Amino acid sequence: MRKIIIIVAVVFLIIGLSYFSHLNPNDQVSKPEKPINITFTGDVMLGRNVNPALYEDPQPFRNVINLTNGTDLTVINLESPITNSTNPRDKLITFKADPQFTKSLKDAGVDVACLANNHIMDYQEQGLNDTIKNLKATGIMYVGAGPNITEAYKPLIIDIKGKRIAIIQASEFADEYYMPPATRNRPGFAPISWDHIKSAIDNAKKAGADYIICEFHYGNEYRYTPNELQKNISHKCIDEGAFMVVGHHPHVPGGIEEYKGHLIFYSLGNCVFDMQNPETRRSMIIVVTIRGNTSIVHIYPINIIGYYPQLMDVDDANAFLDELEYYSNVEIQSKNGVGMIKT
């Protein structure tokens, strides 16, 4: 009898070992997802008065370097072509930056430059082509422009910590004479068009994107609240599966909207710029922490001193965050001059 019991026990042991040996160790203990931290800034313009200042101090992000160089990804709106071209477009205001200062962006931790805006074509197609060449040579990715509209609307795919991030970028402002967009046969930037945006979102999904971020150059200058086009496009993006929407162009910080559990930042304002109006010199840099289906956004209020950003002191930052909340439909918690939004 004892012998039978021993034999039965051995059989069950073998069966049990066989079962557990086929289990994937990763299935037995669920590991928490690693957070992904992404920094976003508003307009970075390295031309006009900023360009000569860069010869004196080539590190425009010196005072916020922990924000731009301390996360998994940093995304800026590059508001000036990087070119030596001497052939500007015939328009009132044109910007360009010395190509040597592309390195200033790389040294600051900039990973992605958004190119779809109303100044990227200031120095014609050559200016755009030079910008792309200089960014590539420095190891900075770009989105929102290209040799044709298909490439300009191509989602930028970035793999971070086992997750796939897709960035889609376009500009509201397109004009055949002053700021010509990309076409089927012409280089340029991606002009806002819902059909193209939806197609880009679909392509990002097909590419296996876990998080789709839409970034737009849109809105009215010096206006703190979104217009109907901004709201309509942003809501549609969320409806189609975008994780969040980030905007710039108004030169002032805009309101923040939570829509169906996702955040829309209608304007991050300026970051590196030479505008003198006090309202255009108060802005923010945001750091988005994504984990699973949730996000925590930290808002860092900045002042532009000279032409470069630096963090506000606590009292000014708290006042800024109170004002920002007034223009938003979200609660902004503040601690030590830093705002926080959870979704």
Predicted regions: what is each one?
Residues 1-11:
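N-terminal Sec-pathway targeting helices
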Residues 6-7, 16-343:
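Acidic, metal/ion-coordinating pockets
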